[in-house]
Amino acid sequence: MPLTLSFLPSFERSLKNLDTEQKEIIRILLKALTAYYDSHSNLHEAQKNAPGFFYKQLRKPFYEAGVERKLRLVIRREGETCAAMMAGNHDQVRRFLANQ
């Protein structure tokens, strides 16, 4: 069964701090992430939508996804349920995780 993605209020709040270009990058990232989850975590399928797509575990239960190194998406993964928690740059992600 493929993983499912939901969005937490903290993710919606983090989008308000992004400019139009960054929001477009997040849109591309979410499309690639959806392809990754729908293909049972096949990285090649996700990279068809976004060649620079990456997905890695930070520490349980937190994962990070991105299509470029500047913007990342923090995901909390529990079983087959994944929740997008926030979008931001490296420093914003570190600060966010320090408070979790």
What are these regions (language model features)?
Residues 1-71, 77-82, 87-100:
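Basic, Lys/Arg-enriched alpha-helical interface segments
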